[in-house]
Every structure is written in structure tokens, then in C-alpha cells.
Amino acid sequence: MESIIRDIKLAKSGHEKISWVDRHMPALNAIGDKLKADQTFKGKTICVSVHLEAKTAYLAEVLHRAGANVIVTGSNPLSTQDDVAAALVEDGLTVYAWYGATDEEYFDFLNKSLDHHPDIIIDDGGDQVHLLHTTRADAMENLLGGTEETTTGVNRLHGLDKAGELKFPMVAANDSYCKYLFDNRYGTGQSTWDGIMRTTNLTVVGKKVVVAGYGWCGKGCAMRAKGLGAHVIVTEVDPIKAIEAVFDGFEVMPMAEAAKVGDIFVTLTGDKDVIRGEHMKNMKDGVVLANAGHFDVEINK
């Protein structure tokens, strides 16, 4: 099946991004050299559903060099980079993704990916797993198992497992030390504020920042906001994490109270409807609402 992307002519820019990543990922390169020499995944089909940008694209290319037939699609319509998708197609991978896909297009891309009947899946957010357990059980015939990248997807997996419905083994990559201690805390913590500041052109110093959720992503976001000079307020439903936030030097209160005083609100819970209409009614005019969770459902629009 042919790839479905926005424009193959964008590939040059995508190659440049992936090449830059290549030079800055020595650990993956070392693993990739071994996998390539052994042809570890020869004859295997791997479906990769991730935030499709240069770093994840390079992972897909490493798997491709290790002999796999790699099928790539995005795990969020708002994060796919069209030039990176084009570069992967030029390098011989199959891609079904473009930026700004509608819900219908997004799930069509996922279904086209699963039409390849994977041996292994790499999921980010749990949508591949959800389809395999609902409408696409036919695509499980070769499936050995897979990995899940993020908190949202791991929560969905735990739900299936608790109900006794999980039909194949999944590795919770999000629960590894290197993921949550470094990527979640430091990576998300920094990139969240980079995105907010570039988008709004606001300084953070002196602002009252409300961080919803004090998991590892929330910890990183709060830490970086404090470093930028903000007064940080944390909202958290888990009493242990709430106490941890207090011990880390942050003020803790319910969202109903925080809504009245915050200037910038950032949700990082992996849950839905964290900020709702009753909260927005009590907010000051001109506040900034931002979501750094996987899906765009934490702020009820």
C-alpha cells in the first residue's frame, strides 16, 4: 500500500532534521548498530504510532535498518511534521500521516497501518491498542506484543489489564527510569514552557502559574516555572503527590480556588475535563490555558 502524506517535496527539510537528530543520539546509534548488524527485526512488521517528528522518525529509521518493515503513523494530528513524514517515505518507510488530520482521517491512518498485520506495535497514547481490542481484532493474528510510550496510554492499558481484557503483552516504556525521570520531568518541563513562551510572547516571571497534576511531567513543569520566576500553584487529586508538591515549595489548592488567581494554567494529568466551565467562569480575563497532556481533552472546550 502506498504512503499517504502531505507533500513528498518537503522531504529535504525532513532529512536535515533527522540528520541533526542522528548526531545527537549516541545511545540509540550504539543500539542501532548492533540491531543492524544482527538484522534483529528481519521479516517483522512494526507499526509505529507516535508523535511524528525528527526524534521518533529516527527511531523508525533505526528499526528499518535492522530489517523491519516499518509502518509509521501519527499518534496526535497536531504533532505530525509533514517534512519529516516525507523524508521517511523517501527512505523507504511506509507512512500514513499529515498535520491537522481530522478525526476521520486520523483513525483511517491508524486502520491503514494495522492493515499490515504487525508483529510488533509501538504505541503512544493507546489508540492502536484500543482499535486492536475493538474493531481491528483481525489485525492481531501475527502480533507478539508492543510498547506504550506515555502515561495516558499506560493508564488505558492498566484499565484493560484490570478488567482481564488485555489480549497481548505490552511493555510500559513510560514506567522506565529513563523515561519518567528524564524525558517526562526534564524534557516535558522545558518544552512546555518553550512552547508557551514562543506562542504567547509573554514573560513568565511574576506570573501566577497553575500546574494541574504533579506527576513527573507536572513536577518538571512546576520546577521550570519556578526557575523562570513564577509563583507556582499546584492542583493535585492524589494526597501524597499534593504533600510532595508542598514539600517541594509550592502552594497547593483545588482548581476551584486556583481558577480565581492564576495567570497561566497548564494541565499535565493524562485525564479529561480537568479545567471545566465552572472554573473558567471564575478566571480573570486574558488568562492563558495550555495543555501538555497527550490528548486535547484536559481542558473542556
Which residue stretches match the model-derived regions?
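Rossmann-like NAD(P)-binding element
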Residues: 115-126, 250-298
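Glycine/serine-rich phosphate-binding loop and adjoining beta1-alpha1 elements at the start
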Residues: 1-41, 72-80, 85-207
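Short internal beta-strands
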Residues: 68-80, 233-236, 292
